[in-house]
Amino acid sequence: LGDGILGTYGVDAILDCADIRSALTGVVLSANDPVAAWGGVKLLRERFKVEPCAVTGPSTDNAVGVDIIRQQMNVPAFNALSDGAALGDCVIEAIGLAGKFPVVAAP
């Protein structure tokens, strides 16, 4: 939606709109570090009543960051560059599309 939940980016105004929130099927939070992930997840949950289906971004650049997010926030965390397929699978599952399309093997 934008470049930040806070500030002049307008994401907060979008998420404040109940009609838009009700149309969301999945939200992936990208965070720079575990503290930003914590704050982003907290804002999404408490202010906007949105449960993120995953966290990605530089906060997931190492196993420690991934573990902190998963354990402290109880949200799946994946590095999109090194574990993109798992992130995709997580989102597909979260939005209810798992098993609805045939899996095509790569050539």
Segments the model singles out, each with a brief description of its role:
Residues 3-89:
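Conserved catalytic-core segment of NTP-binding enzymes
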Residues 83-103:
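C-terminal helix of von Willebrand factor
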